[in-house]
Amino acid sequence: MALLSDLINLNLSETTEKVIVEYIWVGGSGMDLRSKARTLSGPVSDPAKLPKWNYDGSSTGQAPGEDSEVILYPQAIFKDPFRRGNNILVMCDTYTPAGEPIPTNKRCNAAKIFSHPDVAAEVPWYGIEQEYTLLQKEVKWPIGWPVGGFPGPQGPYYCGIGADKAWGRDIVDAHYKACLYAGINISGINGEVMPGQWEYQVGPSVGISAGDELWVSRYILERITEIAGVVLSFDPKPIQGDWNGAGAHTNYSTKSMRNDGGFEVIKKAIEKLGLRHKEHIAAYGEGNERRLTGRHETADINTFLWGVANRGASIRVGRDTEKAGKGYFEDRRPASNMDPYVVTSMIAETTILWKP
């Protein structure tokens, strides 16, 4: 008698050329991901060869009921770690039937910024540190925490090991390998300062691909937590009090910064970011004011500070970069629930295109 798992793991390529394509898009909140699948006649490796598709935007908060169709434009293909074989995941962005990007489509504007010749010439690299919290499904309280109570104070949990310090490692490792399988440039994982909280890093990725890879890595993570019966939270401050929040520190460099004399270019870029601090904060995630308090390795939301090796700064420059006189910097302001299309393109726009 076949088990459910046997059928889920059926190898389609033994009997058919057909493939399953999972179309993924950002939903109406600008933070939720949605997806649905369709069958195609054979393997596809170029997003331009995938058909556009549509969905009911009135059910995702993205269109009115009387004109509910939203069109999906396939943009980036990844291998599907759940169905495996020649089956794929595809990150899409969203348009009206007339071809206008809908308000939650932040990819379209980001792609325009990244295709600007001045930006493209600088080959912007991004490394994004995505923090997240795993919650118990019934009570929405972090895993490993006593229900309605608290664990011991922070200290033992960051990069910690052991049944009394690390909870959810099976999810973390499953996600790590699934992202590598999918073709996402995931570069590492670690346990975070607050118990039940973890981080993974995506990058270095160039331009628009940083946003595509981060969104699909989030999709894969939420699918894995669904299987595990755990709730995934990107809330920037899931637990009030003396507990670290969750961010999405964004590491950034341009060709000029990576070349000799790059430290001077970095300092000019940071100066420009300081002049547009308010605009960046407004675009860096919902609820970030609960996280950026000046405590727990953050700078106060209303203050712009930068420093070498300073984790209480808005922008941190690494000692290696200072020593080499070239390299990258880290924008520590983005919240864990930020839209990577918005954050990556805005950093490029401010540091390369914007003239104060």
Swiss-Prot record:
Gene3D superfamilies per UniProt: Glutamine synthetase, N-terminal domain, Glutamine synthetase/guanido kinase, catalytic domain
Any GO BP annotation: glutamine biosynthetic process
Main location per the UniProt record: cytoplasm
Pfam families: Gln-synt_C, Gln-synt_N
Molecular function terms, GO-annotated: ATP binding; glutamine synthetase activity
Top-rank taxon: Eukaryota
Domain GS beta-grasp positions: 19-99
Protein localization: Cytoplasm
Keywords on record: ATP-binding, Cytoplasm, Ligase, Nucleotide-binding
GO cellular component: cytoplasm
Catalytic activity: L-glutamate + NH4(+) + ATP = L-glutamine + ADP + phosphate + H(+)
Domain (GS catalytic) ranges: 106-356
EC number(s) stated in the UniProt entry for this protein: 6.3.1.2
Ranges that cross the membrane: none
Family: Belongs to the glutamine synthetase family.
Subunit structure: Homooctamer.
Protein name: Glutamine synthetase cytosolic isozyme 1
Species for this entry: Vitis vinifera (Grape)
Gene of this entry: GS1-1
